[in-house]
Amino acid sequence: MKKIKLATLFLAFTTLLSACGGTSSAAQASDPTDHPSESAIMFTDMVDRKITLDEPATRVIALSAADCEIIYALGAEDVLVGRGEFCDWPAEVLELPAVASGRETNLEQILSLQPDVVLMADMDQSEEQVAQLENAGITVVVSDADDVDGVFQSITNTGAMLGKDSEAAALVSSMQNTFASIKENTNDSEKTVYFEVSPLQYGLWAAGADTFMNEIAEMMGLTNIFADVSGWCEVSEEQVIERAPDFIVTISMYFGDGPTPEEEILSRTGWNNIPAVQNNKILNLANNELSRPGPRLADGAKTLYDFISAS
């Protein structure tokens, strides 16, 4: 039970953090050369910092889980020399040295891995930490995707950084095609959905507006029952019961001990009149596909679409 509790709280914590801006946004990028060569790689990162690289990065530390996934999806995993402590997919990424981020960042550890680029989310470091990295000659690239288009931009920037422009374009195109197909095949609907990101045992939290889940729900013509609240929000059982969703999506993890997250939801007192519970329309997406701004966001959307369409 301790494992379940820790994993669930960790999931809720990291999910909440992904919606919060950090303090590195105003940090300045490493000064580009006054006269960059014709072969230099130049792009603007997600917080409008001008990035110039003489050549594609060959030693990268990716601090966010989404950035790790993007690098793997581009077939460039060999450039990774370290990962953020919360990077967990694909499984082989766990073999890389883990680097703490945020307040617990160990700059000496980062420097010891000798990266030429550190790729981080906007929340990962302070301006002072970014400045220290850049003063050590390390290029810092910031990703800050908060919607689907932002994910596309993050993939494009990472492709540029790695000399994988064509692979990045192909990945973005594939994701765009998935989302376009979902939109084209979606009929007008009055159905509603509730996204549960933390279970009852540890306090109910839901995805509201300005989240990937809400954006994807809108693609499918679904109404998020907590679209009136921005970001990730703590909610009550009474609110969920009153709003009576037609579908419930949970991202709670299960370790094989006790009822599954779906079974636990079905057994909650007073929830038996909720349409999603009455009709057993509960989907578990505990693999971060819908909560992580990476390539698998399209896979999560397709899984949700198939689930809704089969209902």
Feature-to-residue mapping (PLM):
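Bacterial Sec-exported substrate-binding components of ABC uptake systems
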Residues: 2-7, 18-66, 165-194, 247, ...
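Hydrophobic core
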Residues: 11, 15-16
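Short helix-initiation/N-cap motifs at beta->coil->alpha
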Residues: 46-48, 97-108, 229-237
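A short, structured surface patch at a secondary-structure boundary
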Residues: 59-113, 117-123
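Alpha-helical, coiled-coil/dimerization segments enriched in small aliphatic residues
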Residues: 86-89, 205-232
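A ligand-binding cleft/hinge motif common to bilobed small-molecule-binding domains
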Residues: 124-135, 242, 247-266
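Extracytoplasmic ligand-binding site segments that recognize negatively charged/polar headgroups
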Residues: 126-129, 144-157, 190-212, 256-259
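Structured C-terminal subdomain patch of bacterial secreted/periplasmic proteins
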Residues: 152-153, 160, 169, 173, ...
